[in-house]
Design a protein with these regions (language model features):
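A generic structural signal for short hydrophobic patches within well-formed alpha-helices
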Residues: 12-13, 39, 116-117
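Active-site neighborhoods of divalent-metal-dependent phosphate/nucleic-acid chemistry enzymes
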Residues: 68-114
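Anionic group-transfer/hydrolysis microenvironments
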Residues: 10, 43, 113-115
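Short, hinge-like loop/turn segments at secondary-structure boundaries
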Residues: 49-53, 86-87, 126-130
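Active-site-proximal, substrate-binding regions of enzyme catalytic domains
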Residues: 37-72, 76
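Short loop->beta-strand "edge-of-pocket" segments that line small-molecule binding or catalytic clefts
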Residues: 5, 31-34, 63-68, 108
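Acidic, PIN/NYN-like endoribonuclease modules and their adjacent C-terminal/linker elements
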Residues: 2, 99, 103-135
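Short, well-structured N-terminal submotif of metal-dependent ribonuclease cores
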Residues: 1-34, 46-58
Length: 135
């Protein structure tokens, strides 16, 4: 079954750190996936906060979340176009990877970043961006 949701780093961190919004993410986790780039952001954030890398990785594996590793030329072009046209939102590469993955698969991008709501319904290269805020 194709994932209905694509999580960004903030959404996954809400589960791991028991932050506000974690209930919503927990409720859709079995229908969600994340890109490896965003997973790397989560591991980095956990390690920076003092969690040993091995523990961070083990904690994330326990969630059994589908991890997407592919990112082709077409997706890179979409991602770059998004980064270039919405610089005003301060989107990182990881943000744009998540948004690209969601738009290309017809899924909803899930985030805690309120700035993303401005992207709801944006069409880039014939793909529509859909956003859900967890808080």
């Amino acid at each position: 079954m194709r994932a209905q949701y694509v999580l960004d780093a903030s959404a996954l961190l809400s589960i791991v750190l028991d932050e506000r919004g974690h209930q919503r993410v927990g409720g859709i986790l079995d229908r969600s996936r994340i890109h490896a780039v965003n997973l790397a952001e989560v591991v980095g954030r956990l390690v920076r906060s003092g969690m040993p890398a091995e523990r961070a990785v083990a904690t994330l594996h326990e969630l059994h979340l589908e991890v997407e590793e592919e990112f082709g030329a077409g997706q890179a072009e979409f991602c770059g176009a998004l980064m270039g046209t919405r610089r005003d939102l301060g989107l990182s590469l990881g943000d744009c990877v998540c948004l690209t993955m969601a738009a290309w698969s017809g899924a909803v991008a899930v985030t805690a970043d309120r700035r993303w709501k401005e992207l709801e319904g944006t069409v880039v290269n014939d793909e529509t961006i859909r956003i859900e805020l967890i808080r």
